[in-house]
From Swiss-Prot:
InterPro entries referenced in this protein's UniProt entry, alphabetically: Trp_synth_b_CS, Trp_synth_beta, Trp_synth_beta/beta-like, TrpB-like_PALP, TrpB-like_PALP_sf
Substrates-to-products reaction catalysed: (1S,2R)-1-C-(indol-3-yl)glycerol 3-phosphate + L-serine = D-glyceraldehyde 3-phosphate + L-tryptophan + H2O
Record-listed E.C. numbers: 4.2.1.20
Organism placement in taxonomy: Bacteria, Pseudomonadati, Pseudomonadota, Betaproteobacteria, Burkholderiales
Organism for this UniProt entry: Albidiferax ferrireducens (strain ATCC BAA-621 / DSM 15236 / T118) (Rhodoferax ferrireducens)
A Pfam family that the UniProt record links to this protein: PALP
Similarity remark: Belongs to the TrpB family.
Record keywords: Amino-acid biosynthesis, Aromatic amino acid biosynthesis, Lyase, Pyridoxal phosphate, Tryptophan biosynthesis
Biological role: The beta subunit is responsible for the synthesis of L-tryptophan from indole and L-serine.
UniProt name for this protein: Tryptophan synthase beta chain
Cofactor entry: pyridoxal 5'-phosphate
Pathway membership, UniProt: Amino-acid biosynthesis; L-tryptophan biosynthesis; L-tryptophan from chorismate: step 5/5
Gene expressing this chain: trpB
Length: 435
């Protein structure tokens, strides 16, 4: 078995992680560390968390054998961990419940969050509505356009959504603004970070809350694999998309000790890995400090963070969780890239072969699984973390596919990142909706 105990007591994953924050936030971070240490294994806290996952979220989420896709692709059997079936439509709710429970116990009546694809914002707004907490969500204005259905969902749930106009107007900038808010309102505000990044203890804490995904898979997979005629009791490979990396770490972490299972993170290659328009921090970045932790960062020779690109708002981020950086360096996980076009093709393919509409983020993982399956035997298996559903992306996909659809952003005079470079696939039909 692979020996693995990370992070160390100071929150370091090898040379990565740590806590690089202003003096104003030092007390808040120390307070959070103490609270998490107190409640992490507290029986009442754990029981409440498990109750919420079962009765509010609807866990466990099922594992589905995508048998038609497996037959058509040839090679390995492909299984999907259906996080898209969770309440709010993605894996994000697993983490927001745990952090909101901490906020209540710490006496913080106000919650802030950042969001890219909008799923973390929706999940935060949802649990704040349930617990009666004030909720403010920061979102890059570019992502507000791309993910307008989720913006309205947040408003319905009582959250205030603040569009961020600085920088590239995407996830990085939303996180910057949320950090500024936290500094200004540290006494009464709890910051629910949505990914496995940020200062310690966030990378560890978010990973722990999300690891329910992989823990369920360890129980579910033996029966699924046996029924499919596979040769092992656990998958040969686990594949997940990586932006900040919370869904990937949630499914990877329980499998780290299983050396026979490959862990493969899929980054957004955008317009191509050599185009300069991508979000592949682990493959094209270098070690640096971003948003309170040391990790791989897309930066220029002067250490300035560079702009990123992806059709998926949730992957459009110039950094990555420090544990992913560590797993890459020690060789326990592999990281690959999928382009906008490959992800868009996988989105349409999964819709039409399995009747599942995936998020554009998840489509990157599906696209790589389709490639990988062809190199494997039929008695081998790939487990894909289908991290979210694609309802939020319908308008964007319509623009990217040049389809005639009534709620395309371009119909509202808005442009979508990547639309000028997207071409419809050969078997793609134009969808016309009656007006």
């Amino acid at each position: 078995m692979f020996e693995y105990q990370q992070p160390d007591p100071r929150g370091h994953f090898g040379i990565y992680g740590g806590s690089f924050v202003s003096e104003t936030l030092t007390h808040a971070i120390n307070e959070l560390k103490a609270a998490y240490a107190k409640y992490q294994f507290d029986p009442a806290f754990v029981a409440e968390f498990n109750y919420e996952l079962a009765h509010f979220v609807g866990r466990p989420s099922p594992v589905y054998h995508a048998d038609r896709m497996s037959r058509e692709q040839g090679g390995a059997q492909i299984f999907l961990k259906r996080e898209d079936l969770n309440h709010t439509g993605a894996h994000k709710i697993n983490n927001t419940i745990g952090q909101a429970m901490l906020a209540r116990r710490m006496g913080k009546p106000r919650v802030i969050a950042e969001t890219g694809a909008g799923q973390h914002g929706v999940a935060t707004a949802t649990i704040c509505a349930r617990y009666g907490l004030e909720c403010v969500v920061y979102m890059g204005s570019e992502d507000v356009k791309r993910q307008s259905p989720n913006v309205y969902r947040m408003n319905l749930l009582g959250a205030t959504v603040v569009p961020v106009e600085s920088g590239s107007r995407t996830l990085k900038d939303a996180l910057n603004e949320a950090m500024r808010d936290w500094v200004a309102n540290v006494d009464n505000t709890f910051y629910i970070i949505g990914t496995v990044a940020g200062p310690h203890p966030y990378p560890m804490m978010v990973r722990d809350f999300q690891s329910v995904i992989g823990k369920e898979c360890l129980v579910q997979m033996p029966e699924m694999l046996q029924a499919a005629g596979c040769h092992t009791t656990q998958p040969d490979a686990v594949v997940a998309c990586v932006g900040g990396g919370s869904n990937a770490m949630g499914i990877f972490h329980p499998y780290i000790a299983h050396e026979a299972t490959r862990l493969i993170g899929v980054e957004a290659a955008g317009l191509g890995m050599d185009s300069g328009k991508h979000s592949a921090s682990l493959q094209r970045g270098s070690p640096g400090v971003l948003h309170g932790n040391r990790t791989y960062v897309l930066q220029d020779d002067n250490g300035q963070v560079t702009e990123t690109h992806s059709i998926s708002a949730g992957l459009d981020y110039p950094g990555v969780g420090p544990e992913h950086a560590f797993l890459k360096d020690i060789g326990r996980a592999e990281y690959v890239g999928i382009t906008d076009q490959e992800a868009l093709a996988a989105f349409h393919y999964l819709c039409r072969t399995e009747g599942i509409i995936p998020a554009l983020e998840s489509s990157h993982a599906v696209a790589y699984a389709m490639k990988l399956a062809k190199t494997m035997r039929p008695d081998q298996s790939i487990l894909v973390n289908l991290s979210g559903r694609g309802d939020k992306d319908i308008g964007t996909v319509a623009d990217l596919s040049h389809a005639d659809f009534y709620c395309r952003p371009s119909c509202k005079g808005q442009s979508v990142k990547g639309a000028d470079n997207a071409q419809p696939s050969a078997n793609q039909q134009v969808v016309k909706v009656a007006q």
